[in-house]
């Protein structure tokens, strides 16, 4: 009975996510000043072989996930050969498959390496195919990638950096190549805001990553309530730093990467 109630409440909550409709707010991208400094910093310390491998895999619609090269598909656990249906009853693991596999693919973090590789190469490849963005924005059959607000937040971060790169690579300035990019990013932003995980047992890292992704969006887009969102987001981030960290910067995560993000 306890498991039944747990599954019902989880499913009810996630169904609210699935049927979310965007607000219709007009978001206008403004290329941020930070990106040139960021690009200069990372361009001098990259593994070009790894970037090239990631790029070639992407051209073949492949990506490495937890050490295994798999297809870029957003509703599969390839390790257990399991395809997720629209309704997933448990948040992470259950007896047939691991939902973290499609979560990891849906984060789209590999796109940052794809774009960096293309930026650094003298002979840039104009054959990049971002049809997967269409699949995300019309993801009726892949609702699993809307199952975790934190993972949606990470996807938004990845796509914002793709947007940043577009403005630095000459041949991708054609709007037709990325007609849905702003729509995907803004949909992710509104979804994350509506589903902040500020309560429950994942408040720590989940909530802060969601706040950080919102702050990155605010730095890249102009819209009517931008100043209000900026003030409230910075206020919440400040509160979370106070709550989650000791004076010597240790915290419950025990992660140096997480500490760097928070501070």
Annotate the PLM regions.
Residues 96-263:
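Aromatic-lined, polymer-binding surfaces characteristic
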Residues 4, 37-41, 54, 58, ...:
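Charge-rich, solvent-exposed alpha-helical interaction surfaces
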Residues 1-37, 41:
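Membrane-proximal basic amphipathic "stem/tether" segments
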Residues 33-50, 116-129:
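Amphipathic repeat-derived elements
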Residues 11-15, 44-45, 195-198:
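Surface-exposed polar/charged interaction patches
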């Amino acid at each position: 009975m306890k498991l039944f109630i747990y599954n019902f409440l989880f499913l009810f909550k996630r169904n609210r996510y699935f049927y979310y409709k965007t607000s219709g707010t007009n978001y206008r991208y403004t290329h941020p000043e930070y990106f040139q400094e960021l690009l200069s910093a990372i361009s001098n310390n990259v593994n070009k072989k790894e970037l090239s491998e990631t790029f070639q895999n992407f051209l073949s619609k492949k990506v490495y996930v937890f050490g295994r090269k798999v297809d870029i598909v957003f509703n599969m656990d390839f390790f257990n050969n399991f395809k997720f249906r629209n309704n997933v009853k448990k948040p992470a693991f259950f007896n047939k498959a691991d939902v973290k596999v499609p979560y990891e693919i849906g984060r789209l973090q590999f796109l940052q390496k794809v774009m960096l590789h293309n930026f650094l190469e003298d002979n840039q490849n104009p054959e990049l195919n971002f049809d997967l963005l269409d699949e995300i924005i019309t993801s009726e059959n892949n609702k699993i990638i809307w199952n975790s607000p934190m993972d949606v937040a990470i996807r938004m971060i990845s796509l914002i950096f793709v947007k940043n790169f577009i403005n630095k690579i000459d041949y991708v300035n054609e709007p037709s190549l990325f007609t849905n990019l702003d729509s995907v990013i803004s949909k992710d932003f509104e979804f994350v805001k509506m589903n902040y995980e500020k309560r429950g047992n994942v408040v720590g890292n989940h909530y802060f990553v969601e706040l950080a992704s919102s702050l990155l969006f605010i730095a890249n887009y102009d819209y009517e309530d931008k100043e209000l969102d900026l003030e409230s987001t910075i206020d919440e981030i400040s509160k979370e730093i106070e709550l989650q960290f000791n004076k010597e910067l240790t915290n419950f995560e025990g992660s140096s990467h997480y500490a760097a993000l928070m501070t």
